[in-house]
Every structure is written in C-alpha cells, then in structure tokens.
Amino acid sequence: MKPLTPRQQQVFDLIKSKIDDTGMPPTRAEIARELGFRSANAAEEHLKALARKQAIEIIPGASRGIRILLEDAANDEQGLPLIGQVAAGEPILAQEHVEAHYQVDPAMFKPQADFLLRVNGESMKDIGIMDGDLLAVHKTQDVRDGQVVVARVDDDVTVKRLERKGSTVLLHAENEEFAPIQVDLTSQHLTIEGLAVGIIRNTDWM
C-alpha cells in the first residue's frame, strides 16, 4: 500500500471514528462538512484516492458505501511525527510532543525528513512558508549560514534563516514586518533542532 498523505489520513481517521462511534461510515456531505471541503465532490475525490491506495473500498450506489480495508492505518505510527507544543527543557521528539503520525514518505525530501512541524504565523511567508503549513525537518545540528533552520532559543522554538556573527546569532524572518531575532550566545541558550527540507501545504493534502 502506498503511504497516505496527511489529508487522506484525516479522511481515513474520520471514517474509522464514525464507524467506531455509530456503526456506520459517514456520507460524502458529512465528510465535507467536518473537514471543511467545499463540496461533497471534493470528499469523493479523497475517497477515490483512498480506494486507489487500498485503504478503503467504495461500494457503488450507497451514500454510506465505504468499507475500511486497512484497519490499522489510523493507529499506524509509521511515517513522520507531527510535533506540537514543545515543553521547556524537553527534546523536540519526546513522545509527549507528538500530535500525530502522517503517512508521508521521509525519502521524498532531501536530505530525508525526520519530523513535521506546524508553521504558526507569517514570518517566513516571502519564501513560501505559510501559516498552517507542515514544515518537513531533517534533524541535524550541522547547518550553514543562510539555511532555514528550526531553532530553539531558550524555551521558544522558531523557524528562521540562520546567520552567525561571532558570539551572536541572527535568526532572520522572510517578511519585512518582522525584525531579526538576535541571540547572544554568552547569555542565551540556542539549540539547532533541524534543517528545513520542504513543506506540505493544506491545499496539497490530496
């Protein structure tokens, strides 16, 4: 079976949840309403994609004609972990930070991605990293000036472009409305959590 995209995983999880709760799968209209699709036709396209990947079977002529083939997909902890709120002093990949696992092939990114981080805010929008995107991150501290990194400054995690100047590090936004973050390494703690290697956009979750 091919890995599910994040959006396909959401649809699959909703189907399984409805079956577990009510004994019946959702209609296309219910899927569209709960996941914010513009129409039932959009939900149908996601169902067809799941069927092509052999996660479900579509039964023709029935509004609730959906049968799950891949029972363990919703709980499968393969794929990339999505990191949520990061607690102070804890490793970024600590289990309590993992919100979900998405069926994304890590090898589609170069270098290979190790985790996903949800983007909050518009500080990097000028290079196409938008609010709500999932940022694919290769976990490494081996980064160069000019690269986009995930950095932890004291207890705050941020995505910025790196510049080193002696005992000072500048973390640059890609939006003129945001000033650089200046880190004094003599008095502040900086950890490079990883290198940005790609994005998954909400509109691409098909």
From Swiss-Prot:
It catalyses: Hydrolysis of Ala-|-Gly bond in repressor LexA. Its EC number is 3.4.21.88. It is an enzyme of class 3 (hydrolase). The keyword rRNA processing does not apply. Pfam families: LexA_DNA_bind (PF01726), Peptidase_S24 (PF00717). Gene3D superfamilies: Umud Fragment, subunit A, Winged helix-like DNA-binding domain superfamily/Winged helix DNA-binding domain. GO terms for molecular function: DNA binding; serine-type endopeptidase activity. Residues 28-48 bind DNA. The active site is at residues 123, 160. The keyword Ribosomal protein does not apply. GO terms for biological process: DNA repair; DNA replication; negative regulation of DNA-templated transcription; proteolysis; SOS response. HAMAP family: LexA. This is LexA repressor. It comes from Vibrio parahaemolyticus serotype O3:K6 (strain RIMD 2210633).
